[in-house]
Curated annotation (Swiss-Prot):
One of its GO terms (molecular function) is ATP binding. Its EC number is 7.1.2.2. This is ATP synthase subunit beta. The gene is atpD. It comes from Anoxybacillus flavithermus (strain DSM 21510 / WK1). InterPro entries: AAA+_ATPase (IPR003593), ATP-synt_VA_C (IPR055190), ATP_synth_F1_bsu (IPR005722), ATPase_a/bsu_AS (IPR020003), ATPase_alpha/beta_chains (IPR050053), ATPase_F1/V1/A1_a/bsu_N (IPR004100), ATPase_F1/V1/A1_a/bsu_N_sf (IPR036121), ATPase_F1/V1/A1_a/bsu_nucl-bd (IPR000194). It catalyses: ATP + H2O + 4 H(+)(in) = ADP + phosphate + 5 H(+)(out). Keywords: ATP synthesis, ATP-binding, Cell membrane, CF(1), Hydrogen ion transport, Ion transport, Membrane, Nucleotide-binding, Translocase, Transport. Its main location: membrane.
């Protein structure tokens, strides 16, 4: 193993000098271990990743944790390989950092556990699956209007407190319960408190045993935040490639991945591009996104929470992400204020899969008719606010009448929210969802009260609820 010495420390960037002919490759992991000799020194166990070659004998590296206590002259060891993290069953139910070290105070990962490098090429063309297959989530509004594709990439937009986390938990729960699938959650540059809450909520709702979690939070150096998404993806790829699973991969938040890359780029002395972002923005995003795909054996479907800086959708970071997305799920605060959960905006959410060739003619027609009805209702709201319902034509009154029932029927109770609502969660198969909305559009349930449609699963539950309300069904 080649040994070198620290010659310069600039915050999270460390320059290391090696002997001639022993220069480590780009992306290699280097280790610095140092025992404190007195009270003034600190114990150091630091991993660096090679980013640049400077001349014949020096490398510039990015630190994966704090560089406190590092001094020039300290010994550095080249591991001869990129950062490698544990994969397989040992990762389920556990929480890791960017290096694949457990941070949940649980037992150590066995030394003989398989480890994979976090840097690897995307699957080859001949390995990719060309079939477009829908991933059934059991969540009506998603399955009907913006369906997810196996191996696809979904953008999850929403401000604070509109239900992103609950939606993520329900997806993890439904994939585990209905499909027996595995989920991997990568917390990239978000609040430590949120990660802690998510871990405990998952423990309480019982989905943690089907989930591996990786965190590189806001307080960590940019190197860790930039690589933690790759750590999570490597764990997800193992379940896809070796076990043939359909894996759900969550990234919260993909913007922080770009932000960390921008910080690293500036520290490495690269010339910034538009809005101060790194010149390699599209390449870095592509290297991550191209690995998220369906192969002949399994799939990795990713759901990426996207923070939009200053609500500017033309900002290079979100704009680069959009180019890779197959579907978007937009959460709307107005809907959550109305008590409609999940607060998914049925008109703003989109999916490439909503076409007759993929979902079938009936599903497509019902979905489009639902959107048309809701759009017309939205247009009529101003008139209703100023003149009242009485001024509408009979036809428009019927549209409003049905649109309100559709709006409420797009809500449902979640399994993971049972402890708060006291109501059992519901998983609705796509066929049942399409049938329910088709019958509402046909006017079959015009006589039932609006409240009967709120927070229920299948259409049969609406009839049952109306019966309990004393309505003649």
């Amino acid at each position: 193993m080649a040994k070198g010495r620290v010659i310069q420390v600039m915050g999270p960037v460390v320059d290391v000098k090696f002997e001639d002919g022993h220069l480590p490759a780009i992306y290699n992991a280097l280790k610095i271990k140092h025992k404190a000799r007195n009270e003034k020194e600190v114990d150091i166990d630091l991993t660096l990743e090679v980013a640049l070659h400077l001349g014949d004998d020096t490398v510039r590296t990015i630190a994966m944790s704090t560089t406190d206590g590092l001094v020039r002259g300290m010994e550095v060891i080249d591991t001869g390989a990129p950062i490698s993290v544990p994969v397989g069953e040992v990762t389920l139910g556990r929480v890791f950092n960017v290096l694949g070290e457990p941070i949940d105070l649980g037992e150590e990962i066995p030394a003989d556990a398989r480890r994979d490098a976090i840097h690897r090429p995307a699957p080859k063309f001949e390995q990719l699956s060309t079939q477009v297959e829908i991933l059934e989530t059991g969540i009506k509004v998603v399955d009907l209007l913006a369906p997810y594709i196996k191996g696809g990439k979904i953008g999850l937009f929403g401000g604070a407190g509109v239900g992103k986390t609950v939606l993520i938990q329900e997806l993890i729960n439904n994939i585990a319960q209905e499909h027996g699938g595995i989920s991997v959650f990568a917390g990239v540059g978000e609040r430590t408190r949120e990660g802690n809450d998510l871990y405990h909520e998952m423990k309480d709702s019982g989905v943690i045993n089907k989930t591996a979690m990786v965190f590189g939070q806001m307080n960590e150096p940019p190197g860790a935040r930039m690589r933690v998404a790759l750590t999570g993806l490597t764990m997800a790829e193992y379940f896809r490639d070796e076990q043939g699973q359909d894996v759900l991969f969550f990234i919260d938040n993909i913007f922080r991945f770009t932000q960390a890359g921008s910080e690293v780029s500036a520290l490495l002395g690269r010339m910034p591009s538009a809005v101060g972002y790194q010149p390699t923005l599209a390449t870095e995003m592509g290297q991550l996104q191209e690995r998220i795909t369906s192969t002949a054996v399994g799939s990795v479907t990713s759901i990426q929470a996207i923070y939009v800086p200053a609500d500017d959708y033309t900002d290079p970071a979100p704009a680069t992400t959009f180019a890779h997305l197959d579907a978007t799920t937009n959460l709307e605060r107005k809907l959550s204020e109305m008590g409609i959960y999940p607060a998914v905006d049925p008109l703003a959410s989109t999916s490439r899969a909503l076409s007759p060739e993929i979902v079938g003619e009936e599903h497509y027609q019902v979905a489009r008719k639902v959107q048309q009805t809701l759009q017309r209702y939205k247009e009529l709201q101003d008139i209703i606010a100023i003149l009242g319902m009485d001024e509408l034509s009979e036809e428009d009154k019927l549209v409003v009448h049905r649109a309100r029932r559709i709006q409420f029927f797009l809500s449902q109770n979640f399994h993971v929210a049972e402890q708060f609502t006291g109501q059992p969660g519901s998983y609705v198969p796509v066929k049942e969802t399409v049938r329910g909305f088709k019958e509402i559009l046909e006017g079959k349930y015009d006589h039932l009260p609006e409240d009967a449609f709120r927070l229920v699963g299948r259409i049969e539950e609406v009839i049952e609820k109306a019966r309990k309300m004393g309505v003649e069904v």
